[in-house]
């Protein structure tokens, strides 16, 4: 089932950390989860062009702390911090809680599966050939030191009458190996022919357990 399950979810608690770092009892859990989803969607939609990879949410009492991982931190922060302040006020208004936002730069966007998937989707919307977009992304990632790369596009590719799935892969992407650091991203391209889904898997190497000194 390693082929079907979300690669990040499978590795949470093994080599990956949680994206929501809070605990709630059963009475509040659903409400807080829904609030998380609203926050993530709001940040993603408002800052889509900034290349947001992931958002980590921490909750302590009546406070919210957001770590926003982005390829373009300057775009999220804005001139003199104007954009990030506006974002903070939006979320405070939405939740009624005190909000702190940390902007974290993604060092290698070419090795971030979510950003790669969104980049390919953006190219498909600009009518660039899907094969060219996928191959270029794969070559860039492998040049940057990825151990393996897999990409898949599904839908009416090139405006074809019948939807199909096409993909490319290079190197090794062992989805069953839990110690393999597999990054996964998904994005959708809204074309005149309909939606095209883009999935990206990037193998960044194996994460070995730390050996304790005896």
Swiss-Prot record:
CDD domains: KH-II_30S_S3. InterPro entries: KH_dom, KH_dom-like_a/b, KH_dom_type_2, KH_sf_prok-type, Ribosomal_S3_C_sf, Ribosomal_uS3_bac-typ, Ribosomal_uS3_C, Ribosomal_uS3_CS. Gene3D superfamilies: 3.30.300.20, Ribosomal protein S3, C-terminal domain. One of its GO terms (molecular function) is mRNA binding. It comes from the Bacteria. Residues 39-107 form the KH type-2 domain. One of its GO terms (cellular component) is cytosolic small ribosomal subunit. Coiled coil: none annotated. GO terms for biological process: translation. The keyword Ribonucleoprotein applies. Keywords: Ribonucleoprotein, Ribosomal protein, RNA-binding, rRNA-binding. The keyword ATP-binding does not apply. Binds the lower part of the 30S subunit head. Binds mRNA in the 70S ribosome, positioning it for translation. Part of the 30S ribosomal subunit. Forms a tight complex with proteins S10 and S14. PANTHER family: 30S/40S RIBOSOMAL PROTEIN S3 (PTHR11760), SMALL RIBOSOMAL SUBUNIT PROTEIN US3C (PTHR11760:SF19). Belongs to the universal ribosomal protein uS3 family. This is Small ribosomal subunit protein uS3. It comes from Halothermothrix orenii (strain H 168 / OCM 544 / DSM 9562).
